[in-house]
């Protein structure tokens, strides 16, 4: 399997892990926001497909970056996932204005991105 395909598969798998654990982190953080439900417009199965596809695309982008820099791939995956989270967080207000100012929602999203980056870095 080529490194690019492996990274895409790892990204897709990491996104599925994210989605499967959402009910748990919703209880832990006290925030009911779900990326999977949002992406699927209320349909969890559709949301999983879209989220897995997004994860695969992120995996391909990760592979392109790791080919150009000489750093530990696990740290790189985590840094890229958290960087994406921080860069795009303000746009969550387009989905739900109350989320952007919620410390619980921010912590939840940070955890989700860290989990995604960890899984991607381990498997890619």
Label the model's feature ranges:
Residues 1-124:
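Short amphipathic, positively biased membrane-proximal segments
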